[in-house]
Amino acid sequence: MTTNGFDPFEWRSFYFPGMSREEAHKLLGEPQVSIGTFLMRDSSRPGEYSLTVREADEGNAVCHYLIERGEPKEDGTAAAGVKIANQSFPDIPALLNHFKMRVLTEASLLAAYKKPIIEVVVGTFKFTGERETDLPFEQGERLEILSKTNQDWWEARNALGTTGLVPANYVQIQMEFHNDRTSKGASQSSIGSSGGGAERFSSASTSSDNIELQPRLPAKAKVTFDRVPNAYDPTQLRVKKGQTVLVTQKMSNGMYKAELDGQIGSVPHTYLRFTAVSE
């Protein structure tokens, strides 16, 4: 499992609605789960949350903390903020960030236990998003599907770890995952990770996906989609479909560093397909 931090503002990516205290305890109590790994779930008290944390290796210790709504205002209007024990915070990200740097009982919050992956999909169209809960993506961008809230909208996670809803008819399934989340840590992402994921998967596409068979770098790769990055970001490489680039490095954010006509920059791995040795 990775312990490279988390984004407090993306707390819904490690929030498990409907999960019981017992299931959360079992998940984080597994021997392979690292100290400081945590998740959020619904409390038995309606409208409030619980923070479940792996605190120690001895006895696979797991602790549960109630996240309460803040005290109602003096005028009787809705409660403001949240609190844990006797400490109050303006919102959940502030609470998580506080305990990222401070100890709860025996450990700080080090790594989020992320939702397991159901499927990996690729965007067939660009989606800009209309609501705060939507997850915008580009054509060709790769996403992890975490849950299918209904037939039309799925919960997804991108290479940066941002989660949100995506329209099902804007993506194409690339891989199906078969997870047993009670026996393995699901914080390992298949997107943006250079290590091997714990999940088992089977291809759901009849076409070959050479990007999964990464050769030793540096290596040549074909560009599969046109890409015009933000003009104000000089670290990104502009490429056109059909061009051949030299990939020199795979970065921790899931992008590749590549060279083209003397220019060096970053390209999302979903825009590249490694060429066979004979090509």
From Swiss-Prot:
The keyword Repeat applies. Keywords: Phagocytosis, Repeat, SH2 domain, SH3 domain. Disruption phenotype: Dead cells/corpses fail to be engulfed. Defective in the migration of distal tip cells and gonad development. Actin halos are absent. GO terms for molecular function: protein-containing complex binding; receptor tyrosine kinase binding; signaling adaptor activity. Residues 202-211 have a biased composition (Polar residues). Residues 181-213 are annotated as: Disordered. Residues 116-176, 214-277 form the SH3 domain. SUPFAM superfamilies: SH2 domain (SSF55550), SH3-domain (SSF50044). InterPro entries: SH2, SH2_dom_sf, SH3-like_dom_sf, SH3_domain, Tyrosine-phos_adapter. Belongs to the CRK family. Required for cell migration and engulfment of cell corpses but not for programmed cell death/apoptosis. Has a role in the migration of the 2 gonadal distal tip cells (DTCs). Plays a role in protecting dopaminergic neurons from oxidative stress-induced degeneration. This is Cell death abnormality protein 2. It comes from Caenorhabditis elegans. The gene is ced-2.
